[in-house]
Amino acid sequence: VKLGLSLRKTSQALKDLYNISISHQQIANYCKTAAVCIKPFVDQYPYEKGDVFTADETYIKIRGIKTYVWLIMNAATRSIIGYQVSDNRGVGPCILAMRMAFRGLTRLPENFKFIADGYSAYPLAAMEFAKKFGKAFAFRITQVIGLTNDDAVSTEHRPFKQMIERLNRTYKASY
C-alpha cells in the first residue's frame, strides 16, 4: 500500500508498528522484484476501454538522463491502458503506447475521442493507425492547447487534459 513514505520512513514504520526490522535498501529490492513479477499481469489485464482516451507525455530524469514516459488513460475509469518509456519524444513511442491502449479492440467505439495536448506526434500516430488498419481505427486527435480556455474545444475538453496532467505530476513527485 502506498502511503507516500520514503523508503527510510517505511522501514521505520514497519519497525514501530510491527516490530519488523528491515533496511530501506531491502524494501527497495522487494519493490523492484514485485514490479518485475506483476508487470506481465498488469500489461495483459483486459482493462475496460471507454469512448474517451486521454494522453500525455512527460519526462523524468533517471541517473541524470532525460527519459520520456507516454501515458494513455481511459477517461471514464482512469485506468492507464497504454504506456511507453523511451529516450525520445518521437512518433514511434507514441504509436507503441497507442498500440497498447488499443489492444483487444477490433474497432474503435462510436463517438470515440482521443484527447491530447498540442504535440505533433499524436496526429501523426493517428494517421499511421488509419493507414495501417483502415476505417475501423480512423480517428482525430482533439488537441487541448495551452493552460487557458481560449476556444470552445479547450473549454469542453480541459478537464480531460487536467486529469492526465495530474497523473503525470503525481508520477513525477513519487519518482
Which functions belong to the PLM regions below?
Residues 118-175:
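Helix-centered, glycine/charged polyanion-binding patches within enzymatic domains
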Residues 52, 70, 113:
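Hydrophobic "anchor" residues on beta-strands that sit immediately upstream
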Residues 20, 47-48, 107-110, 133-140:
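Short helix-terminating capping/connector loops at secondary-structure junctions
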Residues 32-33, 83-107:
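Active-site beta-loop-alpha junctions of metal-dependent nucleic acid enzymes
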Residues 1-53, 57-63, 77:
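Short, positively charged, Gly/Tyr-enriched micro-motifs
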Residues 65-71:
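Short glycine-rich loop/turn motifs
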Residues 111-118:
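Short glycine-rich phosphate-binding loop at a beta-alpha junction
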